Amino acid sequence: MPELPDVVVYLEALSRFIVGKRLERLKLLSPFVLRSVDPSIDSINQQIVRGLRRIGKRIVLEFGRDLFLVIHLMIAGRLRWREPGKKPGMGPKQILAAFEFGDGTLFFTEASSKKRASIQLVKGEESLKALDPGGLEPLEATLDQFRDALRRESHTVKRSLTDPHILSGIGNAYSDEILHTAKLSPLKLTRSLNDDEIVRLYDAMRATLRVWIDQLRNDVRDGFPEKVTAFHNAMAVHGRYKQPCPVCGSPVQRIAYADNECNYCARCQTGGKLLADRSLSRLLKGDWPKSIDELNQ
């Protein structure tokens, strides 16, 4: 799922490619993509794209008449810019919508059969605000605001980082990287964090997001993001199960869930303790190793 760094770079590219230009026509190519009825989606045809915003992981296109088009990429949604006559590079069933401009087309695609990605058209600032879960902006929040938000309820640190009601725009991938940088267990409870750990987490969050925004900007340069992914070779732990941690060399571990997994380094983050994997630990029961040292025996 595209997260804050990915969406920031998308917005910067969209600013170069479509802001100030007239949307000739929006073609909806999937019956599932539109999640709003009023105002009519046709009301933005022939309108100028006046600006862009980000609401968490959502991309907002601003039009006249107080209209806002909200694009939610979800897990497999992507945006692709093509010059006139160029194909989107995806099968027809994966193309959700086409934003046609005079000098090219912005394709909204989804490489999944679940069809979770969506478009909504809303009118007015209040309607737009209603779509915002209200989490803090990670790069704008003060340390005190961050501390208060984390301690408001007792959740695992992993859950709090990815909860859009607490923090805006962070998902599974960058939360893994943040926690590795902060040297914190993903399952540590937020109310058990001491002041030093909160400072470490705050600093790690800001540093990680900034590093990856810069990295993705450097990859895209003046073009359009084409390889938006949750997995990067330069990541420390995310998507690197069984590969060596770049800090200590221990194999990266995982906690498997239904749709994804949490990756961490037991040596760097949990004092060597292996966190229970919901599938394997139940299967192995008493044979489940409790530490990274037992695993390596």
Residue ranges and their predicted role:
Residues 22-40, 53, 58, 79, ...:
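Basic, nucleic-acid-binding surfaces and adjacent catalytic neighborhoods in DNA/RNA-processing proteins
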Residues 63, 69-184, 189-192, 196, ...:
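Phosphate/anion-contacting hairpin/loop surfaces
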Residues 1-129, 267-275, 279-297:
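Acidic, proline/glycine-enriched N-terminal capping motif
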